[in-house]
Amino acid sequence: MSLQLLNPKAESLRRDAALKVNVTSAEGLQSVLETNLGPKGTLKMLVDGAGNIKLTKDGKVLLTEMQIQSPTAVLIARAAAAQDEITGDGTTTVVCLVGELLRQAHRFIQEGVHPRIITDGFEIARKESMKFLDEFKISKTNLSNDREFLLQVARSSLLTKVDADLTEVLTPIVTDAVLSVYDAQADNLDLHMVEIMQMQHLSPKDTTFIKGLVLDHGGRHPDMPTRVKNAYVLILNVSLEYEKTEVNSGFFYSSADQRDKLAASERKFVDAKLKKIIDLKNEVCGMDPDKGFVIINQKGIDPMSLDVFAKHNILALRRAKRRNMERLQLVTGGEAQNSVEDLSPQILGFSGLVYQETIGEEKFTYVTENTDPKSCTILIKGSTHYALAQTKDAVRDGLRAVANVLKDKNIIPGAGAFYIALSRYLRSANMNKLGAKGKTKTGIEAFAEALLVIPKTLVKNSGFDPLDVLAMVEDELDDAQDSDETRYVGVDLNIGDSCDPTIEGIWDSYRVLRNAITGATGIASNLLLCDELLRAGRSTLKETPQ
């Protein structure tokens, strides 16, 4: 009881009790999330303290927004949420694998096997899994020209987040968005150049893809044009309003004339800037009524300046978001200016159509019909906040799924095919050659059995019997082994049978599986080797003297 001598208020759990807490917590978290897994998974309703509702089946959203008390469950939740940050998917998979690895290991520990021996087996199995993954993957080249295949990848990801009807709407939107910002020559892809804009209007099925930019504000003057064709776009980061001096100073006047002169001199600074902008507009547009001029400024524009722009038929937007300034340059081809001293036609962008749309009290400005834009917008629509949030989460995961394939140049057949094939491989492999001797084999056995939790859960969530469906899959794999042919066999969740995911167009991300297996094995091993739980941290509250 050395801990009690050091800290009388400390609480501890030793060996069996600590392991039981860890296993129970992991299984509890698994039982909450496993019903979400796959395209047939169920939704969870999250209600916060203010009564706001969120419907989701996204594991990352659940783990980050649920209130979790158990320290073990918090550890697993944080690690699984980190998986989503890195790869964009696989959160529920990690939680299910950790829970099942601990459950299978606990069975052997109760029979007298030491946790260290099991974790050694886990590590051998993990290394073999990575080798098997590299053999199982299908390499793809020239993906930017294979839109049909990328549509299948996006559909596979989106089906696990939203219903089938909405998936068919979002699949081409997500694929086209990634392709529009992907630079195949430099193999460069920046998903930050895809703007996701929410509009509380219509339904999620009215979500659209804009090959351009949508700004969530409009012109601030009633006389400004709301639709500009063949628009020259000036991107500015210049204050077009009167600013106070940097040093504290005062100006005093003794008559109305002096006040008018003072006001006029204050305006001179801004008027000089306006004159240079209007001169540039006259130079590029002249008297041609088919040409327009648009100013998008990151800083403010005062009412008098707006009035001047309106008189010259210029659409001016003020206080644009900083993140949109870079996107505007990629969309229109213009260059952002920090001053009006060196304005020339070469720094202007061009857009075929800039128009304004008003929904309720909100204004949106569309910058469209551009030549080869390198930034785009996905306009998410929905009648409620939770519908918008659910669609936005699905779109983000879909974007990451397509981006992962373009970056990896590899893909894994889905529908649980990889987990079933890897489990068979580990069970049939010569464990002595793998370096597993004696009781270490129990770790590999536990690992192989735990892998089947993913296909079993997929089938169970579809309403079929997991044992029956997996038996059919095993039979088909046995037939393929007898005839020495390579066959990918997964589970068909629509009819409860086996299927070939490469024919059905069901795919998993290479990097998601790689990170999920590595992450789950690491978490499970650490929790198995934890033989004592201490609640002995310093209190943040100062203790009152006795």
Swiss-Prot record:
Subcellular localization, as worded in the UniProt entry: Cytoplasm
Position of the signal peptide: none
One annotated GO biological process: chaperone mediated protein folding independent of cofactor
Record-linked Pfam families: Cpn60_TCP1 (PF00118)
Molecular-function GO terms, alphabetical: ATP binding; ATP hydrolysis activity; ATP-dependent protein folding chaperone; unfolded protein binding
Location, primary (coarse class): cytoplasm
UniProt keyword Phosphoprotein present: yes
PROSITE patterns: TCP1_1, TCP1_2, TCP1_3
Modified residues (N-acetylserine): 2
Keyword annotations from UniProtKB, A to Z: Acetylation, ATP-binding, Chaperone, Cytoplasm, Nucleotide-binding, Phosphoprotein
InterPro entries membership: Chap_CCT_zeta (IPR012722), Chaperone_TCP-1 (IPR017998), Chaperonin_TCP-1_CS (IPR002194), Cpn60/GroEL/TCP-1 (IPR002423), GroEL-like_apical_dom_sf (IPR027409), GROEL-like_equatorial_sf (IPR027413), TCP-1-like_intermed_sf (IPR027410)
Cysteine pairings via disulfide bonds: none
Annotated Gene Ontology cellular component terms: chaperonin-containing T-complex
Cited Gene3D superfamilies: GroEL (3.50.7.10), GroEL-like equatorial domain (1.10.560.10), TCP-1-like chaperonin intermediate domain (3.30.260.10)
Modified residues (Phosphoserine): 249
Record's subunit section: Heterooligomeric complex of about 850 to 900 kDa that forms two stacked rings, 12 to 16 nm in diameter.
Family: Belongs to the TCP-1 chaperonin family.
Function according to Swiss-Prot or TrEMBL: Molecular chaperone; assists the folding of proteins upon ATP hydrolysis. Known to play a role, in vitro, in the folding of actin and tubulin. In yeast may play a role in mitotic spindle formation.
NCBIfam families: chap_CCT_zeta (TIGR02347)
Full protein name: T-complex protein 1 subunit zeta
Native source organism of the sequence: Saccharomyces cerevisiae (strain ATCC 204508 / S288c)
Gene: CCT6
